[in-house]
């Protein structure tokens, strides 16, 4: 269902729009966590560590998919808000063509350099072979990853957050079932985990594409539209490239962090792998709220209703703080039980490392959600320079403090670096939000 985000009060509009997106992300993260749970429980601690060691590299590829998602979403949102239906259709096909070309390039790069990338992050030798195997299979699904993310970006831009949910419900269930069959029954190890993800991702991408192409039949303009428009391509990439750079910088930072973690051995890597999956689960939920605000902001700018943006920002922050509360309680108080999802009681060192991460990082969710909501407004406004600049200090501080603190606190020092980066990044995004001028409206006092 297509939803106009420019009319009703943000409290009602954002909440109704958000719920299906939240469920979508939750199910997506559940099957990501299921990979690690099944790997750890049925293939062993080393298998969990191997999947976890390759994770920061997969996030680099994800950065490109997310960038194209944002580029398509913001441009389509503006055209939809301006009621340019023909432009919407052309923007979508332009985004598809661009993402497919990019996907092919990334696949070729990943295929030829996967082993080198695993060596760059100093992957422990006992998990190197499994890590490379997982990464090779994952790389074959990059085109599906790009395709699915562009589709979901367009659905979100049109105010339809329910359709992606339906795809994810099916693919999440299928992924978990295939994980169990391939790993627990067939004993395929990490390759079973990778193939399960590949199949689930492929099915979701194809279903999303077929459904979206059907919807586009209703968006015929007065004049015949081309399949690829250079001007729209430039607009999409103006949003996508800074986002890709920002996400890539973060991903490279995560590679450095993974390299530091890897020096402490496979047990700490396994603990970190489980904890970072839980952390990513929470962060992606919060980022979904930010994505809602991006679509909300872009649609209202396209409709000439900028005065609605500050109220939407306040609503988003309130919702995100409420969303953060259960994660903080769960991860801080029940950290041992959370790590027990991935590892058996015999993995004492790994569980201890994961618990330390969760207890140190989770209380700061109340701060990082403010940054992520502000990011949503900034992206929707097209101010991508601000979006990128606010990320770099977070990365530098996180790596710098990790290197320094590990000398005194061991692996725990790595986890302690997270809050320092988040404090600076949140402060910067709030400064940039004020520079956009939306705070000048009397209704926008925050």
Predicted segment positions?
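N-terminal transmembrane alpha-helices
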Residues: 5-42, 56-71, 75, 100-107, ...
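Transmembrane helical elements of multi-pass membrane transporters/channels
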Residues: 16-35, 137, 148, 171, ...
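Short runs within selected transmembrane alpha-helices of multi-pass transporters and secretion channels
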Residues: 69, 138-156, 164-175, 193-208, ...
């Amino acid at each position: 269902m297509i939803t106009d985000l420019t009319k009703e009060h943000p409290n009602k509009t954002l909440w109704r729009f958000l719920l299906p997106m939240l469920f979508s992300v939750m199910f997506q993260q559940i099957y990501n966590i299921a990979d690690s749970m099944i790997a750890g429980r049925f293939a062993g601690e080393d298998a969990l560590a191997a999947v976890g060691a390759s994770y920061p590299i997969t996030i680099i590829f994800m950065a490109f998919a997310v960038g194209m998602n944002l580029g398509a979403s913001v441009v389509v949102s503006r055209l939809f808000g301006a009621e340019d239906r023909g432009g919407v259709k052309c923007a979508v096909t332009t985004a598809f063509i661009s993402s497919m070309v990019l996907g092919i390039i990334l696949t070729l790069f990943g295929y030829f350099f996967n082993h080198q990338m695993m060596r760059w992050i100093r992957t422990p030798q006992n998990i190197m072979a499994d890590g490379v195997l997982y990464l090779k299979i994952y790389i074959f699904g990059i085109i599906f990853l790009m395709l699915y993310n562009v589709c979901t970006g367009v659905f979100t831009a049109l105010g339809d957050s329910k359709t992606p949910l339906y795809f994810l419900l099916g693919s999440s269930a299928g992924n978990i079932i295939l994980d169990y069959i391939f790993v627990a029954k067939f004993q395929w190890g990490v390759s079973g985990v990778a193939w399960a993800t590949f199949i689930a991702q492929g099915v979701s991408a194809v279903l999303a594409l077929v459904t979206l192409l059907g919807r586009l039949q209703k968006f015929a303009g007065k004049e015949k539209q081309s399949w690829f428009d250079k001007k729209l391509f430039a607009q999409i990439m103006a949003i996508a490239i800074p986002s890709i750079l920002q996400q890539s910088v973060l991903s490279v930072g995560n590679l450095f962090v993974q390299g530091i973690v890897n020096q402490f051995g496979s047990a700490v890597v396994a603990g970190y792998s489980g904890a970072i999956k839980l952390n990513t689960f929470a962060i992606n939920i919060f980022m979904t709220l930010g994505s809602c605000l991006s679509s909300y902001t872009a649609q209202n700018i396209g409709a000439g209703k900028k005065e609605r943006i500050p109220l939407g920002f306040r609503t988003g922050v309130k919702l995100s703080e409420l969303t953060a509360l259960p994660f903080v309680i769960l991860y801080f108080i029940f950290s041992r039980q959370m790590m027990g999802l991935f590892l058996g009681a015999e993995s004492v060192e790994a569980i201890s490392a994961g618990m330390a991460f969760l207890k140190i990082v989770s209380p700061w969710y109340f701060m990082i959600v403010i940054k992520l909501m502000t990011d949503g407004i900034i992206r929707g406004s097209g101010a991508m320079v601000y979006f990128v600049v606010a990320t770099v200090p977070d990365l530098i501080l996180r790596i710098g403090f990790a290197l320094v603190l590990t000398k005194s606190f061991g692996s725990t020092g790595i986890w302690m670096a997270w809050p320092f980066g988040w404090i600076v990044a949140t402060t910067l995004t709030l400064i940039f939000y004020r520079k956009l001028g939306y705070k000048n409206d009397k209704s926008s006092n925050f």
